[in-house]
């Protein structure tokens, strides 16, 4: 019996669109924020953008291997801005704002069709809903849920930035289950990746793994091609979820 449906955020509740213009604009805001705190970097926004992308990929690789999420100031100091030798202590006052901007300004987030109504339908049908998200910001997701008008429907919001551990580690799913008061064996999880979401469900013993199609991130799952790892259900629209859960519970 499914009693809770939890969601990933980026790529699941909304699609994430990238562009060189957004990257450069973000880097200019980053430089302006640092300057406002008395830190002047000897680089232009256009020069910083590709370097930041490369550094972020380096951190992503490390975090995916370790399944750990470092504190924001440490990420910016040791990875994202590593060439500039800025200490954690120096970056700490602005680290969260930088991390929030990384997901709010660097990209365009476009809500998926039927997102709010799907979550409201699940809630009306007596199911708990919540979030498990890999993210370096501690404030981006809570602010986003408020903007989407669904914050009050969430029984739990578990972020790697506060948990210190990332999907696909079972621990982050178990933390969400404990906070929702529902065991993993009575939980469904909706995400867009095999490598983090579907594998995480398998690791934690989540009852129902639902993957929503997202071709833009397929390259991150190439290592799992041909391994047999697959979701219980693949969907193309969030509105499919209530019916899937009803059918599961009717078995």
Put a short name on every predicted segment.
Residues 1-5, 15-17, 21, 39-43, ...:
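Asp-based, Mg2+/Mn2+-dependent phosphohydrolase catalytic module
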Residues 9-10, 16, 21-63:
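Conserved phosphoryl-transfer catalytic core
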Residues 67-74, 89-93, 100-129:
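Short, acidic loop-to-helix structural element flanking the phosphoryl-transfer center
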Residues 99-101, 158-159:
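Short beta-strands and strand-loop turn motifs
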Residues 56-70, 102-113, 166-172, 207-208:
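Short amphipathic alpha-helical segments at helix boundaries and their inter-helical linkers
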Residues 21-31, 68-78, 135-136:
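Short acidic alpha-helix initiation/capping motifs at coil-to-helix transition points
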Residues 45-99:
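A metal-dependent, Asp-based hydrolase signature
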């Amino acid at each position: 019996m499914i009693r809770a449906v939890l969601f990933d955020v980026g790529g699941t509740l909304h699609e994430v669109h990238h562009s060189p213009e957004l990257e450069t604009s973000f880097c200019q805001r980053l430089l302006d924020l640092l300057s406002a705190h008395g830190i002047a970097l000897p680089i232009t926004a256009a020069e910083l953008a590709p370097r930041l992308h490369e550094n972020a990929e380096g951190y992503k690789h490390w975090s995916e291997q370790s399944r750990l999420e470092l504190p924001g100031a440490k990420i910016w100091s040791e990875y994202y801005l590593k060439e500039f030798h800025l200490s954690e202590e120096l970056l700490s006052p602005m680290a969260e704002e930088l991390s929030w901007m990384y997901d709010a300004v660097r990209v365009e987030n476009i809500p998926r069709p039927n997102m709010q109504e799907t979550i409201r339908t699940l809630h009306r049908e007596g199911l708990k809903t919540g979030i498990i998200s890999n993210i370096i910001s501690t404030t981006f997701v809570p602010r986003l849920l408020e903007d989407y008008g669904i914050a009050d429907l969430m029984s739990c919001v578990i972020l790697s930035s506060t948990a210190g551990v990332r999907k696909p580690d079972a621990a982050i799913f178990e933390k969400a289950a404990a906070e929702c008061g529902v065991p993993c064996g009575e939980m469904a999880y909706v995400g867009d990746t095999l490598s983090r979401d579907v594998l995480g469900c398998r690791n934690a013993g989540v009852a129902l793994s639902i993957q929503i199609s997202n071709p833009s991130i397929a390259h991150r799952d190439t290592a799992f091609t041909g391994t047999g790892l697959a979701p219980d259900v693949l969907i193309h629209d969030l509105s499919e979820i209530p019916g899937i859960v009803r059918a599961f519970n009717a078995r």
